[in-house]
Amino acid sequence: NLNTFYVTKNSAPREVFKAKLKIDKMSGLNNLFKGSGSFYDCEQNSFDVLIVDEAHRLNKKSGLFSSLGENQIKEIINASMFSIFFIDENQRVTLKDNGSIEEIKKYARYYNASIYKMNLKSQFRCDGSDGYLAWLDNILEISETANFDLDSKYEFKVFDDPNELRKVIEEKNKINNKSRLVAGYCWDWISEGKNKSDV
C-alpha cells in the first residue's frame, strides 16, 4: 500500500509500460506514472517511493520553457521518502541532460538522506549480454575492458556512407523485423546557415 510512482523525463518509456500493463487490465494504470517535471511544487515526503528511470536525462528545471522549480533531482528527493534513481551517465544525449551521480549525492546530502549505491549486472535490452556492452565500451574507448573479441551473435561493421548503412539495416530488417537505425539527438540541425551541408 505504498504511494509509489514510476518517473521518467520522456513519455516513451512510460507509454511502453502502460501498453504492456493494460494487457492485464489494471485499473488506474495512469496513476502509476509521472513525468520528471511533476514535483517542483510538491511538499516534502508527499510520496513513499519514486522510481526514476533514465535519471541521466533529468533537466535542471521543469516546464515547457524550463522556468519552473529549481532542480528536478532536488525536487524528486524532496517529494519522496525513498527515491530510486537508475542512471547511466554515458547515455546523456542532449546538452540539457543534467542527471549525474554527483548531483544525486549532493541533494541527498542536502536532505540528510541515506545513500545506497548499487550496480546493475546486465541490461535487459541487450539480452543480458554484458560481454557485448563491455566490448562496446572498449571499442569506443569509453572504458578499458578485457573484452577484445565480439560474441559471434553480433556483427560489427564500419560504414563510410550512411546510405549504405541504411540499406544494409533495411535488408537485415526483412529477415525478422528486429533491425533499427537510431541516433542520439543533441541539438537542432537547421537546414540554413553553417550546418546546411550536414542536414
Predicted feature locations:
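Conserved beta-strand -> loop -> alpha-helix junction used to position metal-binding or nucleic-acid-contacting
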Residues: N30-G37, D53, A113-F124
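Signature of the SF2 helicase/ATPase Hel1-core->accessory helical subdomain module
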Residues: I51-N119
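Inter-Walker segment of RecA-like/P-loop motor cores
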Residues: N3-L50
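Conserved motor-region signature of P-loop NTPase helicases/translocases
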Residues: N1-K9, N98, E102-I104, Y116, ...
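Cofactor-binding loop segments of dinucleotide-utilizing enzymes, especially the Rossmann-like FAD-
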Residues: K9, D88, C186
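Conserved helicase/translocase motor-coupling segment
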Residues: T94-G99, A113-A134, E141-V199
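Short secondary-structure boundary/capping segments
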Residues: K20-K25, L64-L68, K96-K105, A134-D137, ...
